[in-house]
Amino acid sequence: MSKNISNLDIEACIATLQYLLDDTNQLFELPEEQRVALFKAAGGLTRPNRDEFQRRRKDAKKAVKRKMIAKDTHARKTTGIRSAREAALFVAPKLLAASSIPDETLELESPRNCYVCKAVYTKLHHFYDTMCTECGDLNYAKRFQTTDLQDQVAVITGSRLKIGYHITLMLLRSGATVVATTRFPADSAIRFSKEDDYNQWSDRLHIHGLDLRHIPSVEIFCNYIEQKYNRLDILINNAAQTVRRPSGFYFHLMENEKLPINELPKLAQNLLKDHVSCLEELSSLSVNSSNTSKNNSLPVTWHGPEPGIGLRNSAELSQIPYSFDNTLQTAEVFPEGELDADLQQVDLRNTNSWRLKLGEIETTEMVEVQLVNAVAPFVLCNRLSNVMMKENTGKKHIINVSAMEGKFHRFKKADRHPHTNMAKAALNMLTHTSATTFAKSGIYMNAVDTGWVTDEDPAALSKKKVEIHDFQPPLDIVDGAARVMDPLIDGINTGKHWCGKFLKDYFPIDW
């Protein structure tokens, strides 16, 4: 059985051996059996045979490697991006003043390849643990860049959390009026109402409930935007379904979502006024409007008598289960009250669709992914481009949030999640096909890869990767948001707009 030997044990051993060397007579006072055992142990330690010598060489190399790994792990832990992840609730790190950035940065014992440029580096950036200094400086500056978007109107989907949440804040803090959609409008409004600078932009944020899986509701939403706004400058198709979550994943949100909007906190109510107006207008147009209030007690279904179920009951639609969800033990895989750093339900399922291959994926999930990631963005671009074309300012943008999964020009393609790959490839083709025509009207359309922000693997596998490899995604959600916003912000600031490009790490790559 292995034993951890302390420094005191080693010092006592050395002192004993030195004592016997100084007074060899003491050796012969020992019982013969003990003396022979001592000589064998000392000799084996100082004069190992060939096999023992080889074993020690291997052990020595392993010990050196362990020390290098431990030192590098400690060094990476000091970077800003990793320090921010230690908090129970994610808070976007503030911009560090130049005087606060240490002149001397830590060096890695083992060289690594930069996440962005792939160059070998050992000098750690103060914020990023996966980038060389040059790429780290560029990426850090991009997190905090701004531009003047005063009087501009933006529509963004998937605005409630993570990348979409920070894109929305960047738009608001640059002066834009933002129409933000989400399936869970009450939760979204509560989140935004807690921002310190809420009073500076709250009158310019309009949150709407919208389930992009229900395309007739997306069409109705486009009608509303066409009637409500006489201009539209920015369209960001951010919402995406990567891993489908069963109804139990969203159950904790339903308490607030089922409340009448006038019973939510006052600051949250203010952000939902336009949504209320939209629903009232929708109700007045319904042929069954007189029965709408009576139908609130009925279960929500995809096929109801009133139009716009994806607007009226966007949150409730998340609670419609599929037959293949019945095998889940909801209380076990979605433990009540356990939320992650983004205040999302912890998901303890052993596997998810990110790990699945063709032949293992439910048809309904494949259809959902196409609706959210490709069909809804098509409808929004198709319909809202007419509003955008009313005035040619020469600096309007459509940004389709894509991913490397949708890229064709790769020599090797992993065989997992083909349904999400299909959807992102379709979104890329939409961008590639239509961008040139839109540019003639001063609308610049691009697709953007957000970078590796989230580990989509099941929780148990993600935990194992952390324990064994000290793995964390190289970027955070603010980096993802900055990448999405860059063609807009950098284009306005420099006057040079990307058009018809697939952007990764702020620069075009092959489709």
Give residue ranges: language-model regions.
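Rossmann-fold cofactor-recognition segment
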Residues: 196-216, 305-310, 317-318, 354, ...
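C-terminal helical subdomain
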Residues: 279-333, 464-511
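A glycine-rich helix->loop->beta "capping" turn
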Residues: 202-205, 224-237
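Conserved glycine-rich Rossmann-like NAD(P)H-binding loop of the short-chain dehydrogenase/reductase
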Residues: 174-192, 206, 234-237, 244-273
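Canonical Rossmann dinucleotide-binding motif of NAD(H)/NADP(H)-dependent dehydrogenases/reductases
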Residues: 140-185
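Active-site helix of classical SDR
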Residues: 381, 423
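Conserved Rossmann-fold SDR core element
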Residues: 204, 231, 435-450, 494-502
